[in-house]
Regions:
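Helix-enriched interaction subdomains in cytosolic or periplasmic regions
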Residues: 1-13
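Non-catalytic C-terminal accessory region of glycerolipid acyltransferases
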Residues: 2-4, 125-232
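Catalytic core of membrane glycerolipid acyltransferases/transacylases, capturing the structured
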Residues: 38-125
Length: 232
């Protein structure tokens, strides 16, 4: 994949931190079925815990912003509760409560440091979601990209994604009305092989032209992501 051409739009202390961390990390392999990434795009990817988002942060070639749950952006107390009650017991599927409580508590300061550096766009399950969309549109207008992990992880992170939450289609539809026909890249991180498989991008207008509903578009792209996960 092409080297980064842009100065990362992150705070100086975070850029320094990631530059140091990258010295100890192995670069992932990127496999493209079509064109490589471009500016002002929408990227959908599986989550795979914390390793996938951080690997993207280190090596993605263009400026972008992540979407993330609002509970992780509302202070240490909210973050700690989310780690203890959702991330470890539900997303990571830890069975015992005590380790979830201890690791969630001890991990909050480090996680807060990371989230402050990532500058995540918070997302919501209610009317406040439209504020997330508006903020994302402002980012796209700067020729930056949005990276989303839309998988339904209510039963934990899984290799075979059960479904995509369709919120990203609201963003894509709003962007189209604003004159931005976003190329959508579906991407799958294969953790054991430390590589990203990236499907050929498809414009949102092409998906709409098929007469599909937002749920049908979401289902199609979820299946595309699962297909990439089986890539040999």
């Amino acid at each position: 994949m092409k080297k980064r051409k842009q100065k990362r739009n992150r705070k100086l202390w975070w850029r320094i931190s990631t530059s140091i961390v990258k010295l100890t990390k192995k670069k992932p392999k990127w496999v493209f079925e079509g064109e490589e990434f471009c500016e002002q795009s929408l990227i959908l990817c599986n989550h795979v815990g914390t390793k996938c988002p951080l690997t993207i942060e280190y090596y993605f070639p263009y400026n972008f912003r992540f979407w993330g749950v609002h509970e992780m952006t509302e202070g240490w107390r909210s973050m700690c509760r989310y780690l203890q009650n959702v991330f470890f017991p539900v997303r990571k599927r830890w069975k015992k409560k005590l380790p979830c409580k201890i690791v969630g508590f001890l991990g909050t300061p480090f996680t807060a440091y990371i989230y402050a550096g990532l500058d995540i766009i918070p997302t919501y399950q209610d009317f406040r979601f439209m504020a997330s969309v508006k903020q994302s549109i402002d980012v796209l207008k700067k020729n930056e990209s949005i990276i989303i992990f839309p998988e339904d992880s209510s039963n934990g992170y899984q290799d075979e994604l059960p479904k995509f939450n369709a919120g990203f289609t609201t963003l894509a539809a709003k962007a189209l009305r604003e004159g931005m026909d976003l190329p959508i890249y579906t991407m799958y991180y294969q953790k054991k092989k430390h590589r990203f498989i990236v499907a050929k991008p498809i414009k949102y207008s092409e998906l709409v032209s098929k007469g599909w509903s937002k749920d049908e578009i979401s289902e199609f792209l979820c299946q595309e992501c699962n297909r990439l996960g089986k890539y040999e």
